[in-house]
């Protein structure tokens, strides 16, 4: 069973839908997200990275709040670097006058910190239910159904439709049916 949407699922979203989804998302630790890094502003080309949120940093600004998301892998590597730096400090003194070009790499690297506005969540089934509820899908009276015998899942807006087995969105995967409902509400 598919547990969350994928990067491919995000490709069909309009810019308005991406912005709306970002606004509805309250990032939490261990959420999976897609981070977008502008590679060519003139041609509107972006590199997309899938990452796990390790930390959410919220800062108050004049205009409201600014949220940054730190990649879980980056948190782990920062901790490892701090530990090794302490060991090096205790082992010997570093001579900063010696410069070696091999000490630095100027290659493109995946970012460790993302602005929330540059990210889109790869929603889980539970997060999609939350978004449908926030958006008032079916005036709060929506339902999901999974028929194992027919290998069908669906989402509907009106409980009266459920009696007649009417579904707004159907798919073999509940995740895909919910995603179609979420896209419809965005």
Model-derived regions, located:
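Glycine-rich anion-binding surface patch
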Residues: 1-186
